[in-house]
Amino acid sequence: MRTSLPILALTSSLAPTNAARAYSEWLASSFIDRQTPIDAGYGPAVLWEGIARAGAHISPTSPLLKAAEAKVSSLVSADGTLDGWDPEWYSLDDIRIGNNLLYFYQRSGDAKLKTAADGLRQQLNRWPRTPSGGFWHRAPIYEDQMWLDGIYMADTFYATYVSLFERENVTAWEEIALQFDLIEEHCRNHTSNLLVHGYDEAKDAVWADPVTGASPLVWNRAAGWYFMALIDTLQVYPSDLPGYARLLGYFVTLADGLERSQDGGGGWWLIMNEGYEAREGNYIEASATAMFSYGLLRGVRDGLLEEKYKAVGLKAYELLVDEFVREDGNGTISFLGTVQVGSLNSNASFEYYTSIPLAENDARGSGAFLFAAIEEELL
């Protein structure tokens, strides 16, 4: 773990502290101590789900869990209106907060949270779709485009909602699986078992392959979002429906690709295409490493992956603690090394992805690290 304290102080003070305090509780508490705000964007949604899970990991009455519940509740008015939500604005990123609403609705039964989630679910019925039935990542900006990111943003919510309130809606379950099927058809490399960032069904984007419509590069966080989407959706998808076996196959296949592409130090490169590891500008990035660690450890715990993947996930987690967690000297810790963004609203080139700055305490990376830390602590 990195530290902002003098090097000589490490031997006497830092190691015992680390041994005594779980990283999930420590990082979650650090965000509370920093009075971190919330909005309905996907980044805060991931972070505050991580804080909520960290609290539940400790106790059903944990102050962390109560703090997260209060934050999420503050986004919804008494009549169930979600702050800033526009029912005519179609961006899959904006569906992600639905998971938080459902998490705390199950906990509290607060009807306003269900009402807000209902609005998101109904919006999915109206969502613009590709000719093959895939949700546009954003309308009208990304017409006919599907990104791996969007699967995590929307389909984990869609699956959770249907599991709670429409369990017998086979049409909905089939549509959820279809979103993964389309990504697999267009974005999977069957040699590396990794997936590129997204595809354009119309093949109009500057980056689109003229045959498949796929973008050219494997951006690690897009693959991380997709890996987490698979493991989280498999928690609620009915195992007796045909889609379950397909999703499980996609998950296991990606785990194989991750094992083979893991760097010797335990992390994953920002751009994961074979041969790019030594390319100047590429680097080991923290948020995706956390996402992969979480998915691998959770997959083993749930019996979906072979035991060998535990070592892969733990190696990644140990790297995160050693290289991307910093003690700040005031009782808090910070999570480092998260790339700020990656978008197909670009030329999708190596130079584009590697030009994006890194951030400290980024909500996306920190939330993913909380997920991974909980899994490591459950071992």
What does each model-found stretch correspond to?
Residues 1-19:
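Fungal secretory targeting signals
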Residues 86, 140-142, 204, 274-275:
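Short, solvent-exposed loop/turn elements at beta->coil junctions and helix N-caps
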Residues 104-107, 120-131, 157-164, 179, ...:
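Mid-sequence acidic-hydrophobic segments that form the walls
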Residues 10-11, 156, 369:
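Extended rod-forming repeat segments used as scaffolds/tethers
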Residues 12-15, 234, 377:
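Residue-level signal for alpha-helical transmembrane segments in multi-pass membrane proteins
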Residues 148-151, 155-293, 305-350, 360, ...:
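Extended ligand-binding clefts on enzyme/binding-domain cores
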Residues 132-141, 271-273:
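Acidic interhelical loop/turn segments
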